[in-house]
Amino acid sequence: MKYSVELACDSSKAWLDTVMDDFGSFLQDHADCERKASAMAMSFVAKYPNRKEIIPELIETAIEELEHFQQVYNLMERKGIALPSEMQKDVYMQQLMALTHGGTPDTRFRDRLLMASIVECRGCERFKLVSEHIEDEELSRFYKVLWASEAKHGNIFVKMALKYFENKEVYDRLDELIQKEAEIVSALPLRPALH
Protein backbone atom coordinates (compact mmCIF):
# COMPACT_ATOMS: atom_id res chain seq x y z
CA MET A 1 0.00 0.00 0.00
CA LYS A 2 1.28 3.44 -0.94
CA TYR A 3 1.50 6.09 1.79
CA SER A 4 3.85 8.60 0.15
CA VAL A 5 2.58 11.71 -1.60
CA GLU A 6 4.00 12.87 -4.91
CA LEU A 7 3.48 16.60 -5.31
CA ALA A 8 2.18 17.83 -8.67
CA CYS A 9 4.71 20.66 -8.99
CA ASP A 10 8.16 21.54 -7.71
CA SER A 11 8.95 24.68 -5.76
CA SER A 12 10.42 27.36 -7.99
CA LYS A 13 13.99 28.62 -8.09
CA ALA A 14 12.53 32.09 -7.48
CA TRP A 15 11.11 30.85 -4.15
CA LEU A 16 14.49 29.38 -3.17
CA ASP A 17 16.31 32.60 -4.14
CA THR A 18 13.85 34.64 -2.06
CA VAL A 19 14.51 32.42 0.97
CA MET A 20 18.29 32.54 0.55
CA ASP A 21 18.20 36.34 0.30
CA ASP A 22 16.50 36.69 3.71
CA PHE A 23 17.19 33.54 5.68
CA GLY A 24 16.54 35.18 9.04
CA SER A 25 12.92 35.82 8.05
CA PHE A 26 12.66 32.26 6.75
CA LEU A 27 13.81 30.92 10.14
CA GLN A 28 11.21 33.03 11.91
CA ASP A 29 8.47 31.70 9.64
CA HIS A 30 9.78 28.15 9.94
CA ALA A 31 9.61 28.33 13.74
CA ASP A 32 6.02 29.51 13.52
CA CYS A 33 5.12 26.68 11.11
CA GLU A 34 6.54 24.05 13.49
CA ARG A 35 4.52 25.51 16.35
CA LYS A 36 1.36 25.42 14.20
CA ALA A 37 2.08 21.85 13.06
CA SER A 38 2.25 20.72 16.67
CA ALA A 39 -1.03 22.50 17.42
CA MET A 40 -2.65 20.97 14.32
CA ALA A 41 -1.78 17.42 15.40
CA MET A 42 -3.27 18.09 18.83
CA SER A 43 -6.35 19.68 17.27
CA PHE A 44 -7.13 16.29 15.69
CA VAL A 45 -7.01 14.76 19.17
CA ALA A 46 -9.31 17.47 20.53
CA LYS A 47 -11.82 17.33 17.64
CA TYR A 48 -11.84 13.57 17.11
CA PRO A 49 -11.35 11.90 20.52
CA ASN A 50 -13.39 8.92 19.29
CA ARG A 51 -10.71 8.10 16.66
CA LYS A 52 -8.72 6.18 19.26
CA GLU A 53 -6.64 4.22 16.75
CA ILE A 54 -4.71 7.32 15.66
CA ILE A 55 -4.45 9.29 18.92
CA PRO A 56 -1.06 7.83 19.99
CA GLU A 57 0.52 8.72 16.62
CA LEU A 58 -1.02 12.18 16.70
CA ILE A 59 0.42 12.85 20.15
CA GLU A 60 3.82 11.57 19.04
CA THR A 61 3.68 13.81 15.94
CA ALA A 62 2.69 16.84 18.03
CA ILE A 63 5.63 16.26 20.38
CA GLU A 64 8.05 15.84 17.47
CA GLU A 65 6.82 19.04 15.81
CA LEU A 66 7.21 20.89 19.12
CA GLU A 67 10.76 19.53 19.37
CA HIS A 68 11.40 20.89 15.86
CA PHE A 69 10.12 24.27 17.04
CA GLN A 70 12.56 24.12 19.95
CA GLN A 71 15.43 23.20 17.61
CA VAL A 72 14.64 26.08 15.24
CA TYR A 73 14.30 28.45 18.19
CA ASN A 74 17.68 27.34 19.61
CA LEU A 75 19.29 27.80 16.21
CA MET A 76 17.77 31.29 15.93
CA GLU A 77 19.07 32.18 19.39
CA ARG A 78 22.63 31.17 18.39
CA LYS A 79 22.35 33.32 15.29
CA GLY A 80 20.87 36.32 17.14
CA ILE A 81 17.46 36.09 15.46
CA ALA A 82 14.42 36.80 17.65
CA LEU A 83 10.96 35.34 17.30
CA PRO A 84 8.78 37.95 15.57
CA SER A 85 6.19 39.78 17.63
CA GLU A 86 3.61 39.09 14.92
CA MET A 87 3.50 36.66 12.01
CA GLN A 88 1.99 37.30 8.59
CA LYS A 89 -1.10 35.32 7.66
CA ASP A 90 -0.28 32.09 5.87
CA VAL A 91 -2.23 32.49 2.61
CA TYR A 92 -1.16 29.00 1.49
CA MET A 93 -2.71 27.34 4.55
CA GLN A 94 -5.84 29.50 4.36
CA GLN A 95 -6.45 28.49 0.75
CA LEU A 96 -5.73 24.82 1.43
CA MET A 97 -7.99 24.66 4.47
CA ALA A 98 -10.81 26.25 2.47
CA LEU A 99 -10.76 23.09 0.33
CA THR A 100 -11.71 21.00 3.38
CA HIS A 101 -14.89 22.98 4.17
CA GLY A 102 -18.31 21.61 3.33
CA GLY A 103 -19.35 18.00 3.06
CA THR A 104 -20.05 15.75 6.02
CA PRO A 105 -18.07 15.58 9.28
CA ASP A 106 -16.46 12.37 7.95
CA THR A 107 -15.36 13.90 4.65
CA ARG A 108 -13.99 16.96 6.46
CA PHE A 109 -12.00 14.64 8.74
CA ARG A 110 -10.66 12.74 5.71
CA ASP A 111 -9.75 15.93 3.87
CA ARG A 112 -8.00 17.44 6.89
CA LEU A 113 -5.83 14.32 7.22
CA LEU A 114 -4.97 14.35 3.53
CA MET A 115 -4.26 18.08 3.59
CA ALA A 116 -1.93 17.59 6.55
CA SER A 117 -0.09 14.98 4.51
CA ILE A 118 0.32 17.31 1.53
CA VAL A 119 1.53 20.20 3.72
CA GLU A 120 4.12 17.97 5.39
CA CYS A 121 5.32 16.76 1.98
CA ARG A 122 5.64 20.33 0.69
CA GLY A 123 7.67 21.17 3.78
CA CYS A 124 9.84 18.13 3.15
CA GLU A 125 10.46 19.16 -0.47
CA ARG A 126 11.37 22.70 0.54
CA PHE A 127 13.61 21.68 3.46
CA LYS A 128 15.48 19.39 1.08
CA LEU A 129 16.02 22.29 -1.34
CA VAL A 130 17.29 24.47 1.49
CA SER A 131 19.64 21.75 2.76
CA GLU A 132 21.14 21.32 -0.72
CA HIS A 133 21.64 25.01 -1.48
CA ILE A 134 22.53 26.78 1.75
CA GLU A 135 26.23 27.40 2.32
CA ASP A 136 26.10 27.38 6.13
CA GLU A 137 27.12 23.81 7.06
CA GLU A 138 25.19 23.77 10.35
CA LEU A 139 21.99 24.85 8.58
CA SER A 140 22.56 22.38 5.76
CA ARG A 141 22.86 19.48 8.24
CA PHE A 142 19.87 20.71 10.22
CA TYR A 143 17.58 20.88 7.19
CA LYS A 144 18.78 17.52 5.89
CA VAL A 145 17.62 15.88 9.13
CA LEU A 146 14.34 17.81 9.07
CA TRP A 147 13.29 16.88 5.56
CA ALA A 148 13.60 13.18 6.42
CA SER A 149 11.33 13.71 9.42
CA GLU A 150 8.75 15.67 7.43
CA ALA A 151 8.58 12.87 4.83
CA LYS A 152 7.63 10.47 7.62
CA HIS A 153 4.87 12.82 8.81
CA GLY A 154 3.40 13.03 5.31
CA ASN A 155 3.12 9.26 5.23
CA ILE A 156 1.57 9.06 8.70
CA PHE A 157 -1.47 11.16 7.78
CA VAL A 158 -2.25 9.12 4.63
CA LYS A 159 -1.94 5.94 6.70
CA MET A 160 -4.38 7.42 9.24
CA ALA A 161 -6.93 8.22 6.52
CA LEU A 162 -6.70 4.65 5.23
CA LYS A 163 -7.74 3.34 8.67
CA TYR A 164 -11.17 4.94 8.22
CA PHE A 165 -11.82 5.23 4.48
CA GLU A 166 -11.65 2.97 1.43
CA ASN A 167 -8.40 3.02 -0.56
CA LYS A 168 -10.02 4.33 -3.74
CA GLU A 169 -11.79 7.14 -1.90
CA VAL A 170 -8.55 8.20 -0.17
CA TYR A 171 -6.36 8.10 -3.26
CA ASP A 172 -8.93 9.76 -5.55
CA ARG A 173 -9.42 12.63 -3.11
CA LEU A 174 -5.68 12.85 -2.46
CA ASP A 175 -5.05 13.24 -6.20
CA GLU A 176 -7.64 16.04 -6.38
CA LEU A 177 -6.12 17.88 -3.42
CA ILE A 178 -2.57 17.49 -4.79
CA GLN A 179 -3.63 19.16 -8.03
CA LYS A 180 -5.31 22.00 -6.13
CA GLU A 181 -2.22 22.43 -3.94
CA ALA A 182 -0.05 22.78 -7.07
CA GLU A 183 -2.32 25.57 -8.35
CA ILE A 184 -2.17 27.34 -4.98
CA VAL A 185 1.59 27.05 -4.49
CA SER A 186 2.29 28.19 -8.07
CA ALA A 187 0.24 31.37 -7.55
CA LEU A 188 1.65 32.36 -4.15
CA PRO A 189 3.49 35.68 -3.87
CA LEU A 190 7.20 35.19 -3.24
CA ARG A 191 8.31 35.71 0.34
CA PRO A 192 11.04 34.26 2.59
CA ALA A 193 8.69 31.76 4.18
CA LEU A 194 8.05 28.04 4.12
CA HIS A 195 4.80 28.60 2.20
Region locations from a protein language model:
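Non-heme di-metal
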Residues: M1-H195
